[in-house]
Amino acid sequence: MVWHYTNDVALYCRAFRSMPHCLRERQYFMVKDHDLLLKLTGELVSVNINRYKCGYCGACVGVCPKGALELVETWIEVDESTCIKCGICDRICPVGAIEVMK
């Protein structure tokens, strides 16, 4: 399950990192309203990253709608003031290193 962002449109796909595949196979739906996106994913409070599980692939950084995640050397940094707690990073992480808690 993958969220891709193009401007203000979120494309939800079932296959990891396969935007061309999603567009070709029509295995996605679009969410244009970020408030609706928050309703779909739930309102969340904190983002915890398990640095021992994280492979630093950058998948979470690429899908963050607010750019709150940054890959700095060998760490993922979360800007809590920018993060909207949507939980998309949690859902995209291929190794389950991110946990967004209520």
Curated annotation (Swiss-Prot):
Pfam families, A to Z: Fer4 (PF00037)
SUPFAM superfamilies: 4Fe-4S ferredoxins
Entry's Gene Ontology molecular function annotations: 4 iron, 4 sulfur cluster binding; metal ion binding; oxidoreductase activity
GO biological-process terms attached to the record: glycerophospholipid metabolic process
Secretion signal span: none
Cofactor note: Binds 2 [4Fe-4S] clusters.
Residues noted as binding [4Fe-4S] cluster 1 in the record, renumbered to the chain: C54, C57, C60, C93
Keywords associated with the record: 4Fe-4S, Electron transport, Iron, Iron-sulfur, Metal-binding, Repeat, Transport
Keyword Metal-binding: yes
PROSITE patterns according to UniProt: 4FE4S_FER_1, 4FE4S_FER_2
Domain 4Fe-4S ferredoxin-type: 45-73, 74-102
Taxonomy, superkingdom: Archaea
Cofactor (UniProt): [4Fe-4S] cluster
Sequence positions that bind [4Fe-4S] cluster 2: C64, C83, C86, C89
Annotated metabolic or biological route of this protein: Membrane lipid metabolism; glycerophospholipid metabolism
Other comment: This ferredoxin is encoded just downstream from the GGR gene in the genome of M.acetivorans.
Biological function: Ferredoxin that is the specific electron donor for the geranylgeranyl reductase GGR involved in the biosynthesis of archaeal membrane lipids.
Alphabetical list of PANTHER family matching this protein: ADENYLYLSULFATE REDUCTASE, BETA SUBUNIT, L-ASPARTATE SEMIALDEHYDE SULFURTRANSFERASE IRON-SULFUR SUBUNIT
Protein name: Ferredoxin
